[in-house]
């Protein structure tokens, strides 16, 4: 699952623990851990990934993909 690496990278950029991200996304810790381990999401639970994505985007994370299909994340930092 491509999301797993992006979620781990985004969390690292923010300096968040799995517990912090799970809380901000409104998910159980075990659910987030399963997704980060690349064990996938249960059928019909794509909404779980959307919750994670929204929590990360609200913190300034952008999910990116280039025209070669490579994926990644970047973080927007406000200038002072």
Task: For the regions a language model picked out, list residue spans one by one.
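Short alpha-helical DNA-recognition segment
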Residues: 17-34
